[in-house]
Amino acid sequence: MENRGRNPSFLSLLLLLSLFAIASAKVFFEERFEDGWEKRWVKSEWKKDESMAGEWNYTSGKWNGDANDKGIQTSEDYRFYAISAEFPEFSNKDNTLVFQFSVKHEQKLDCGGGYMKLLSGEVDQKKFGGDTPYSIMFGPDICGYSTKKVHAIFNYNDTNHLIKKDVPCETDQLTHVYTFILRPDATYSILIDNQEKQTGSLYTDWDLLPAKKIKDPEAKKPEDWDDKEFIPDPEDKKPEGYDDIPAEITDPEAKKPEDWDDEEDGEWTAPTIPNPEYKGPWKAKKIKNPNYKGKWKAPMIDNPEFKDDPELYVYPKLRYVGVELWQVKSGTLFDNVLVCDDPEYAKQLAEETWGKQKDAEKAAFEELEKKREEEETKDDPVESDAEDEDEAEADDSDKDDADKSDDKDDDQHDEL
């Protein structure tokens, strides 16, 4: 029998090549929040004067897949949060940029951010806040029913530009990994839990540059342009007597009341009702216009204001990563922050952390939810009484069934 399997040496070569590619990845910043993390991160004093600065907890959360894998979590409601870390300055020119992190909303978030930022140049980390310029902002944002999306915002020429596509974010209480990939050809991908959710181009999905083509402002619709798709049928004629049909007629079912007195009530007149034969003003039926040319559109021309930027994707002085957000309800946990140039390395990191822990985390969450529901049932006397009544009704029903069964057995016994 012919062996159609892969040559073991070939598979080994593929594995080695894959490992080599990952090993050659440039990692500009990687934070798993292990020992010493506080030396790498600077807590901002932004909003402290107003007593509105929130504190961070170092924790693995109330439920997790590994109690030893910790991150930083917002801990106070109705607070602003700002924290950042510095890494050696680099440019993503001619290279792929990968920005990835995990986030978990333990608080059943109803309004608050879960995004992170990449910043360039010189930043006073102690003053890092909402007004600090940034290069890229990326991650989930939730507020009410209307906002449940992934932000992907680019700063270009000192203006922040939001992505024009809608990318829904995860809204449960489990950990999810968000990945943004920006390539030298100005294309991008957004991944959630290693699954691509959106992809496209900086040229089309953001308004970073003026449009390449615009409608010709000098163009005018030709006078003989027929844009009526349907026209009245010239062969259709109005039926004879059509205009003589009244809109209302006397109700043939109406009868003069027996107690009607003409001398006192006046002459009785039957009420009128809509005439079922009346069809309204006559209109000729519509037919397709044989001269229809379609809806007129101005021709597109080159936009004189468009100037291409081959370095549209480039951020030459990336140097910081930070979290800056407002939360109505706290409990968001950030972990496993990565800035690198290799999507495969990012994928591997996600699998080594989130991938290995997700099932255990989900099981732990479901167990806690089960206990919480049981406790709420115990603490709710109305619900407990209702359950007792249901049980009592069930017992009475069982008793009635048993009595009926006994009576039936007695009847059968008498017949015997």
Curated annotation (Swiss-Prot):
Please list which residues make up the signal peptide: 1-25
Keyword flag Chaperone: yes
Coiled coil location: none
**Compositionally biased spans, kind Basic and acidic residues:** 217-241, 351-381, 401-416
Q: Which domain of life is it from?
A: Eukaryota
Official protein name in the record: Calreticulin
Does the keyword Transmembrane helix belong to this entry? no
Q: Which organism is it from?
A: Beta vulgaris (Sugar beet)
Record's comment describing the protein's domains: Can be divided into a N-terminal globular domain, a proline-rich P-domain forming an elongated arm-like structure and a C-terminal acidic domain. The P-domain binds one molecule of calcium with high affinity, whereas the acidic C-domain binds multiple calcium ions with low affinity.
